[in-house]
Amino acid sequence: MGYKRKQKEKQKDFKKAKLKVGKTAKKPDNYTDTSFKAKTISLPGQSISIVHGSKDFTHQLSLLKHHSSTTRKEVVINITQNLPSNPAAYKLIISAAVPLILDESKLVRTEVMNLLKEIGSKQPGLLDLHKRSIVLFIISAMTHIQPDIRNTSTKFLATLLEYSDLKLYFVKILKNFFILMSWSLLDDNKSKGVSITTNSTILLGPNTKKARIDHLRVLVQFLKKNLLDDSEQGLVDADFSRIYTHPQTYKYLIPTTPQAFLALNLFGREIKSDLSATGSIAIQNLDTMTTEDIETRLNIMNDIFKDRMILNLKGLCKEGGEVGREASTCIDILEGISVK
């Protein structure tokens, strides 16, 4: 009996105990509890998400140089829909997006135009701060070798005219309008003949002929804003007359325009004037002149551009349609201006 009892006790260790419903097996004496509970710590001032957002923003800007036009378009759309509230970030956005004015894809250029409009509406005056680089790319687009890029160039110019002042670039933009429309600034008979027959020029393709309507509309807008907008003196007189100050007080205040005395050339080398016997401005002197005041712009228009523009616009008036109407509007503006 004693032997059988010992055998049963030894076999207990190798038998699986049958547990009742709801009962758990008894834990051995040498059991060690290895379970643990995790707790999260929230720090309101932690910058983990901010760093991640900055990295994501930088990555998006880098995708603007992606080889796929679809990717570039989607990135521009995403940036347009999620513009930051911090104005400091707009410098990076404009610097990265403005080169896409020369993008080969028309869809990308359209989205860049929408981006510039959104920036202008959300941050007034911001496009005016970056107008120098934007104008450079617009001028490059106006003289680009691809017709599609030339056709959309004036649309960017119209957007910039809405939110910025382009008086300093009056001459450059007009000269590139002549190139865009295949007009000539020369006086010889050969150039006049070419300037009249604009339909036979190499730069005008089928799509470009349709785009001339947009070009002329923007030209009308450009001329009105730079030649007919004489509100500077009127606003000053109106404001100061309301508060009953001396009429000449505004002359002794800080100028409202940047580099107001640039025309005096106080810090530059004196350049000999190339005026003709009648006192008109020479073409060679255009690049050295500042055009912030309306008198200078009117003199430049009357001496250099007016007669040649009217000559070429009359050729467009003969075509009729919308092109003829816009050309006729330009002629009315040019014939109505006078030196003040």
From Swiss-Prot:
Keywords annotated in UniProt: Nucleus, Ribosome biogenesis, rRNA processing
Superkingdom as given in the UniProt entry: Eukaryota
Main subcellular location of this protein, as a coarse class: nucleus
One function term, GO molecular function aspect: chromatin binding
Pfam families: Ipi1_N
Gene Ontology CC, one term: rixosome complex
Places the protein is found: Nucleus
Example GO biological process: pre-replicative complex assembly involved in nuclear cell cycle DNA replication
Region span, Disordered: 1-20
PANTHER family: REGULATOR OF MICROTUBULE DYNAMICS PROTEIN (PTHR16056), TESTIS-EXPRESSED PROTEIN 10 (PTHR16056:SF2)
Family membership noted in the UniProt record: Belongs to the IPI1/TEX10 family.
Protein task: Component of the RIX1 complex required for processing of ITS2 sequences from 35S pre-rRNA.
Subunit text: Component of the RIX1 complex, composed of IPI1, RIX1/IPI2 and IPI3 in a 1:2:2 stoichiometry. The complex interacts (via RIX1) with MDN1 (via its hexameric AAA ATPase ring) and the pre-60S ribosome particles.
Name of this protein: Pre-rRNA-processing protein IPI1
Organism: Lodderomyces elongisporus (strain ATCC 11503 / CBS 2605 / JCM 1781 / NBRC 1676 / NRRL YB-4239)
Taxonomic lineage from the root: Eukaryota, Fungi, Dikarya, Ascomycota, Saccharomycotina
Gene transcribed to yield this protein: IPI1
